Structure formats: C-alpha cells, structure tokens
C-alpha cells in the first residue's frame, strides 16, 4: 500500500482467466498442497536409491529378476551379507499398493509367504524376504515330477482359503472387488477381445460361457489367490511359498485349485495322470464333504473359466505388448481349455478351443 501511495500505478495485477479461484487461506492448507506437489512419483525412484532407503545395495553382477504388472525386482544385500528381494512398483495396477499389507496379514496368520521386511508406499518400494529363485514351474521340467512341492503348495492354498479372509479382515486390509458376475463377465470378454480379436460369438456359445459364472457364483467365498500357477509358487526344501498374491480377493476356492491343475506352464510328461493326483489331493485339502463327481465337475467348470482369462492374457501380452514369451503358452492354454470344457460338458467351448489351438499351432 505504501508503494502504491508513493508511485501510483507501480504495482501491477494479474487477471486469472480460469473458471474459479481457490484461496489456500491457511498455512496448513498451503503446506498440504505443497506436500502433494512434492510427493514422489510412485515407482520412479532409481533402483540404487531404492535399495539405499533401507540400508541395502544391489547384488554385484546380478541381472534384474523378471517382473511385470508395473513392478521390477532386484536381489539386494546388506553389508553383513544378508540378502532380500527389492520390489519397486508403480500405479499401473491398483493392487500393487496392497501387496505389502496383504503379505503382513498372511505371514502373521502362519501362511507360507515372504516376510515383508520394509516398505515405503509413497516411493513404491517394498523389501521382501529372499526365498531364492526356484519355482514350481522350473522344478516341473526336471525328469522327476516334484510331487512333494506340489502337495505342499496345495496345503498352503488350503491354509489361505481357511485363514486368509479373517486374517486380512482383522488387519483392516482392503481387497480388490470380489469375484462375481461382473468379474467373470470381464474375464470372458478379455478372451473374446484378445484371442478372438473381438469376433462376435454366436448366442449359444455366449450362453454356454455365461453358465460358468452361474455355477461358480453359487459357491461359498473364501480368500483366493487368483493367480495360483506354478511360476507364483517358490520352493525351498520341498516346501511351497506363495508369491504374487496382490490380486487376492473373495471368490470360489475351485478357481485356485483349477489354476494349478490346468496350469499351461506345467507341460511335463504324463501331465494328464498328474492332474488326477493333484485333483485328489486338492479334494483332501479342501476337506470336501460332497461327492467326488461334484468336486470334479466344479473343478472343471472353474478351470474353463480360469483358462478363458489366462488365454486372454497370453494373447494380450503377446500380440499387443510384444511379449513372445507369453504368446508361446497360448496353444497349450487352448489345449487345456479344450480338455477342461469337455470334462464339464461345455461342448461348444471345447470345440471352439480345439479349433483355435489347431489354428494357433499352424500359425506358429
């Protein structure tokens, strides 16, 4: 005001053309807005800096470990030689932010998952117990089928189904949307969009696909892993440890069992016979009180639904994101879909999958 009085016109103004004006008002409001602006972009931190946050350094000469879904993994070590797994995640998938909290809850419940050692959610940095690199998929390619590890994986899955929901609820951990008609429909559409390239299905085939959700939605809900396949099961001394459970949600237990029984990554000799063994042990682990036929039917219904989703993922990642390693599994996924759909009487789905498997094999 003194300046204006001394030299009229010396203080200029600015006319804001925006539709509205927000006055920050208080110092507290200003500090809150400033903090939001200065907040780090989740997952943008350099790997070396992420390791330093918790006193670790990258392991010399070791390449990054395969990741995906907006995550990257590295083995890190402390000066005393102890190692851990460093996970840097971004906001590509909303479930990435929940991995640490779900992991804490499941570990506290006694389920075999990596212990969460540290986390900075703002930076998108998670430090996990190092359980090694051996997964069930790798073991299945050896001459002897890794039955002890498979049995252990099913038993840990049983613990997850019995204890998981209460564990995350007690810990106040929010979960992704539960399985229901909406999610089952999305999985089917994912298959149509990516495997069939959006080709319109005839009404009878659409109706047959829709019956899968009706049968699964009527079952009791437990906490399901949602991606219970051999690459997401680490093995140490024949004991299984579950990883990549960030998509866990309430759903039908058969979805998880079917994910392993008909896992397209499991292509070892005599896999058809091993599927019977895996199904039998799954029934024991589930403490199933119904008939053998009902369990088998629901397992194959769930496998058909699951494989629609899995094949959709292989096609999407392979054709739209250039991941030839995923596209290579599409023919086996379609062959497994043919078997599962046939065994639960979904003949139209089985016929479609068989035709697609043949066409995919020829195109390769």
Protein language model regions, located:
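A short, conserved alpha-helix in the catalytic core of glycosyltransferases
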Residues: 1-8
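ATP-binding pocket architecture of kinase catalytic cores
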Residues: 65, 74-186, 190, 196-197, ...
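Active-site acidic catalytic loop and adjacent metal/ATP-binding pocket
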Residues: 70-77, 86, 160, 210-257
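Active-site activation/catalytic loop segments of kinase-like enzymes and analogous catalytic loops
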Residues: 189-198, 253-289, 303-321, 333-340
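ATP/Mg2+ or Mg2+-diphosphate-binding catalytic cores
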Residues: 312-364
């Amino acid at each position: 005001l003194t300046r204006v009085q001394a030299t009229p016109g010396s203080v200029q103004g600015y006319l804001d053309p925006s539709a509205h004006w927000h006055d920050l008002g208080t110092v507290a409001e200003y500090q809150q807005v400033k903090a939001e602006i200065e907040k780090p972009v989740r997952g943008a931190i350099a790997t070396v800096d992420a390791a330093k946050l918790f006193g670790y350094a990258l392991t010399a000469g070791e390449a990054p470990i395969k990741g995906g879904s907006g995550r990257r993994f590295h083995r890190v070590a402390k000066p005393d030689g102890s190692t851990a797994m460093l996970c840097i995640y971004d906001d590509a998938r909303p479930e990435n932010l929940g991995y640490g909290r779900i992991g804490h809850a499941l570990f506290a419940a006694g389920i075999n998952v990596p212990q969460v050692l540290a986390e900075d959610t703002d930076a998108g940095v998670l430090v996990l117990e190092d359980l090694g690199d051996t997964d069930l998929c790798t073991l299945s390619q050896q001459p002897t089928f890794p039955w002890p590890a498979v049995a252990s994986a099913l038993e840990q899955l049983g613990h997850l189904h019995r204890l998981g929901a209460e564990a995350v609820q007690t810990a106040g951990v929010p979960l992704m949307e539960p399985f229901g008609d909406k999610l089952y429909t999305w999985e089917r559409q994912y298959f149509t969009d990516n495997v069939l390239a959006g080709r319109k299905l005839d009404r009878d085939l659409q109706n047959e696909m829709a019956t899968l959700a009706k049968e699964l939605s009527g079952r009791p809900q437990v906490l399901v892993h949602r991606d219970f396949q051999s690459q997401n099961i680490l093995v140490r001394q024949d004991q299984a440890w579950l990883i990549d459970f960030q998509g866990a949600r309430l759903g039908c237990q058969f979805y998880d069992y079917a994910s392993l029984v008909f896992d397209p990554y499991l292509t070892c000799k005599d896999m058809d016979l091993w599927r019977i063994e895996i199904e039998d042990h799954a029934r024991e682990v589930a403490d199933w009180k119904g008939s053998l036929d009902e369990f088998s039917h629901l397992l194959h219904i769930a496998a058909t639904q699951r494989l629609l989703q899995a094949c959709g993922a292989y096609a999407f990642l392979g054709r739209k994101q250039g991941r030839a390693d995923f596209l290579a599994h599409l023919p086996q996924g379609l062959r497994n879909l043919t078997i599962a759909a046939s065994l639960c009487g979904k003949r139209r789905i089985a016929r479609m999958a068989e035709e697609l498997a043949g066409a995919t094999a020829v195109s390769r």
